[in-house]
Amino acid sequence: MLIDGNCHTVVQSHNKRNFDYCLHNQTEMFIFASKTDISMNSKITVAALMATTLTIGGCKTQESNMTTAGEAGHTNALLEKSKNIHGIESFDKLTVDDYREAILEGVGEQKKNVETIAGNKAKPTFQNTIAALDRSGEALNRASATFWPLSSSNSTPEFRALDKELSPILSAHSDDIYMNDKLFERVKAVYDEADSTSLSKEEMKVTENIYKRFERNGANLSDEDKEKLRQLNLEISDLQVQFSQNLLHETNNTFVTVDKLEDLQGLPQSDIDRAAAMAAAQGQTGKWMFNMQRASCNPVLQYCSNRELRRKIYQAYCNRGNQDNDYDSKEICAKLVKLRLERAKLMGFKNCASQILDTRMAKTPEAVYALLDQVWTPAVAKANEELEDIRTEMKKDGLDCEPEGWDYRYYLERARKAKFNFDESKLSEYLEINNVLKGVFYVANKLYGVSFKEITDKAPAYEPTAQAWEVYDADSTLLAIFYSDYMPRDGKRAGAWCTSFRGQRYDGGSRVEPVVVNVCSMTPPSADKPALQTIDNVETMFHEFGHALHSFMRDVHYSSVANVERDFVELPSQINEHWAFEPQVLDVYAKHYVTGEKLPQELLDKYIAASKYGQGFATVEYLAASYSDMDLHVLTEVPDDLDVMKFEEEKLRQRGIPRQIQPRYRITNFSHTMGGGYTAGYYSYLWAEVLDADGFEAFKETGDIFNQEVASRFRKYVLTPGGIDDGMTMYRNFRGAEPKIDALLKNRGLAE
């Protein structure tokens, strides 16, 4: 597999309701950063791949379930053909040293592949040059596709040390390929003659993609500029790894401790129990502790009446990476902005955003700002309406002061209860995680005819709580292998994402099924209750499974056309969220965890009435982060004394952001943009939401949300082709027209 420094592997995800963090990226090794397979399998540069996956950095030591190198009879399973069911790797038998050995051997093997292709004396053809490059590096891909996902979900100090060790090696390896003059001459020769050959549409696209990838990675630069680019790539890769590891440490090792139970008034008992367990794990039995994982701190911000505790947690969360300690990332962020601009200018672009967007649907920063601006004004107006409701609720508590950031979620939840008599915790009693997963599978079956057979007891396990399924198509052929990894743990970075241990490919004319995993940190079971989920968590499960469906159904012969544009990749995931709370879907999975009773119509009606409340806040905090991402990367000059926090604050103040709302991620904890993967790309969730909102209308217009003709078109034109066509072409093929923003604004309650 050819690597491309401009691609990623984890798909950083979110759900539309709160634009939450779910990593996604693209490629066979990607994590989509989602999320290895952002619903794309493509060639990515190992270095970028790393940086993206590492976007999350370090955390506390956890016990490893891996064997220790040097044990009697130990062999490196990555260097042997897997004998497991469906050729899945033996995760439990691999050591960190095994990964190092296999990845380095893979680098050596790909170097030989490339030397052979570049030194071929025969006339350059698609088969002996383009296809050969596309196939190169299979051993490296196999090892990387196992290591990178586990470095995000099962990280240990040893994993993180290997991350840092491999980063410069893989960055240099990528540069060696794309700056190989003889190799580029052969690629260019095939590209220049492509129109006069009998190549298929897919082969033409592969040729174009590989040629342009060489261009984007410096093949046309002078020797002097190539050396500059190499150095920039190394520095950027290293800084992204540092940022990611700082953030992981700050997220998992920043604690707020509570000594008295009465200080947790209003917090659901299940969250109190988890805080007690966290404290006990930290040697603080009898106390309650919260770290900066959203599953830990969000319930406090939403339900706890203790204003001082909310303040402490809110500020600790917002200030991750901005505490002037050993894990402070302000200087790292400033350096990244500066180096990315240098690299963009070296490649002939006026700024970093222009360089990145050149290969996206949006094409230009101006198009991105036009979309953000179109939503910003109604979103701020709605947020200001919500602030009035918050002030009203605060006065009931005798607080005649202006709301602060730590008041927003708590009083907004109270206002929602007052307006709609809706209590989300009551709905959660019907959202047990195994039942929700049945609902996820039900939707996939109704839309596409796929079915699932659990093989957890047969498939190799990389984590005891993970489950595995065979996924069968409507004609009973094996389509994919699916792993679900939903429980939080030390060593798992924050958020949710989709990745692949093996991307879809062909071997000797036969389709090889992908091995896809959804990774999340959902609400775990408590002492007396099963794993009951929030609305956001349910939407996240549907979201990540939408990415998984994209990976299951992709059917391409060359990995260089597996990826889609970053601002298109969220369409399959976000459209899948639309079915989560449809009444006929809820009827299948929403059952009370004690009685088995189906969700009462009265509670469903209250949820529907309240579902759009709070969208001003949710939309503004997302847009604020998107603006910050773009504002930093459209700079054409970066001052040596750039203070990224002051820059962010001033830009948002000029736009009129309500004082009580912070960006969803402050710059020093904004892994999407600073960790790589979604640099100048956080807007893509909104871009894709225009597509998914308009796309779901295609189902609704028929009067049947499971309309088979529409579902068949979506699969044929969106899920299956990979990146053979550009995103807008695929969307038009599906919908018959370009998307309109109307449905998005209506869905968010920002328009009538």
Where are the regions a protein language model picked out?
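Short, positively charged and aromatic/hydrophobic N-terminal segments
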Residues: 9-14, 18-24, 29-31, 36
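Short His/Asp/Glu-rich catalytic/ion-coordination signatures at enzyme active sites or charged loops
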Residues: 83-98, 147-166, 189-231, 291-331, ...
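N-terminal helix-rich structural modules
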Residues: 17, 65-268
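C-terminal motif of bacterial Sec signal peptides marking the signal peptidase cleavage site
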Residues: 55-58
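C-terminal, non-catalytic "cap/extension" segments appended to globular domains
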Residues: 68-93, 287, 435, 439-453, ...
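Bacterial N-terminal signal peptides that target proteins for export
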Residues: 37-46
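Short pre-active-site segment immediately N-terminal to the catalytic Zn-binding motif
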Residues: 523-541
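Active-site-proximal, well-structured secondary-structure segments within enzyme catalytic domains
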Residues: 202, 206, 238, 245, ...
